[in-house]
């Protein structure tokens, strides 16, 4: 047998219906702009302003002073 006759493969032209280069899908869980049928509607998120908290600021300064003294 002739080995060169056995070692070949065929190449087919891509279909003409493709609209452009293939791009991979986004990772699982990555939000997309398109809504999929069966997805639950997104709930509205309400945020509340907590205002200025002087105790938190004082605690942060105290923590920095303690860490500075320890190291």
UniProtKB/Swiss-Prot annotation:
Family matches, as InterPro entries: CYSTM_dom, WIH1-like
This protein's record includes keyword Transcription regulation: no
Membrane topology recorded in Swiss-Prot or TrEMBL: Single-pass membrane protein
Protein name per Swiss-Prot or TrEMBL: Protein CYSTEINE-RICH TRANSMEMBRANE MODULE 8
Function summary: Involved in resistance to abiotic stress.
Transmembrane segments: 48-64
Main location: membrane
Organism: Arabidopsis thaliana (Mouse-ear cress)
Source species taxonomy: Eukaryota, Viridiplantae, Streptophyta, Embryophyta, Tracheophyta
Top-rank taxon: Eukaryota
UniProt region (Disordered), positions on chain: 1-35
